[in-house]
């Protein structure tokens, strides 16, 4: 978690932390969740009335339990996101080129070791992305 703070995070919640205990109920306007899984219910609890939950991944698990009351009684919006408008990627690259944000690479693997990369990825002990390097 120190590594995440070093690159600019103001507040860090661990993978196994209770998000409701860490943030408090109805304390957040928007949740961007790239993980999914068991933390889904807690993510909805921390959203304020009219809040938005955006999902763009499910590496923590694609199936979740939803109490519909936590959704409709707070007038929440659930948004799936897999594609960006054309200028978004160019803007992201610009931020990286200017050093305003930097990708966090946990580890690199030669492409022929993709099975090792997948195995290590599933252990969930890393911070950042894995990069596969194709042969020259």
Where are these regions (language model features)?
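Rossmann-fold dehydrogenase core element
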Residues: 49-54, 65-105
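Conserved helix-to-beta-strand junction in the class I
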Residues: 45-47
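C-terminal hydrophobic helical "lid"/dimerization subdomain
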Residues: 86-136
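Adenosine-nucleotide cofactor-binding segment
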Residues: 1-39
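Glycine- and other small-residue-rich loops at beta-strand/loop junctions that grip anionic moieties
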Residues: 13, 29-33, 56-57, 81, ...
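A general structural signal for well-ordered alpha-helical segments in protein cores
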Residues: 28, 40, 68, 89-93, ...
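Terminal peptide-recognition signature
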Residues: 4, 31, 43, 78, ...
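Short, glycine/polar-rich helix-capping loops at beta-to-alpha or helix-loop-helix junctions
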Residues: 1-3, 63-68
